A protein has these predicted regions:
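Charged, heptad-repeat coiled-coil alpha-helices that serve as long linker/dimerization "arms"
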Residues: 1-62
Length: 62
């Protein structure tokens, strides 16, 4: 199933905004005092990066 370019672009923008929020949280040294929270944020960050990469690949498809 192919989503329209506009939908994919909005999805990328939304995920990139969430990624920036996670980057802000991960930049806070206090986060690392709670290992479980830090692991959760890193897991979410990695998942979002993979989703964004996949969306960019779909956007590049003819």
């Amino acid at each position: 199933m192919h989503l329209g370019r506009g939908i994919i672009e909005r999805d990328i923008e939304s995920r990139e905004a969430a990624l920036r929020e996670l980057e802000t949280q991960l930049a806070d040294p206090e986060v690392y005092h709670d290992g479980a929270r830090a692991r959760d944020l890193v897991t979410r960050y990695d998942r979002l990066r993979a989703e964004i990469e996949s969306l960019w690949q779909r956007l590049a498809e003819p």
